Amino acid sequence: MTQLAREFGAYVIGTGRAADRQTVLDFDAQEFVDLDNDALEDVGEVDLVFDVIGGDIGKRSAGLIRAGGTLVSIVGPSGARPAGGLAVDFVVESDRAQLSQIVQRVRDGRLRTNIGNIAILDDAVAALNSTERRNGKTIIRVRP
């Protein structure tokens, strides 16, 4: 999401744990807020929050949205509503043309992925239920 936002001209502030700092910056965020050590509220007002965490962080993030801004949550209804802004739940809809554009961005090197683990289909449950903290997404290989 960070890379797409930057491609369309957004100034991106990423958040996470200190261990995530370099990864977030490598994926094109211009600033990083360490949620364990920095005051999220020091960011100031923003136009858009893309919430992938929810809970207290989601609620605090909603408070940063300026009038007319938007909170987008992929973790379901957050219960947080930005004052003077809009809150929407992120819904994925199949769109062949958009998927083709995303694939082309990956092929062109304009959109990078962060793959942390590749597992075969027989090991999918164990790979997805792992309690081990991983960097990157888990890919399940359907065919050997």
Name what the model sees in each region:
Residues M1-P144:
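Terminal helix/beta-alpha structural elements that buttress the NAD(P)+-binding lobe
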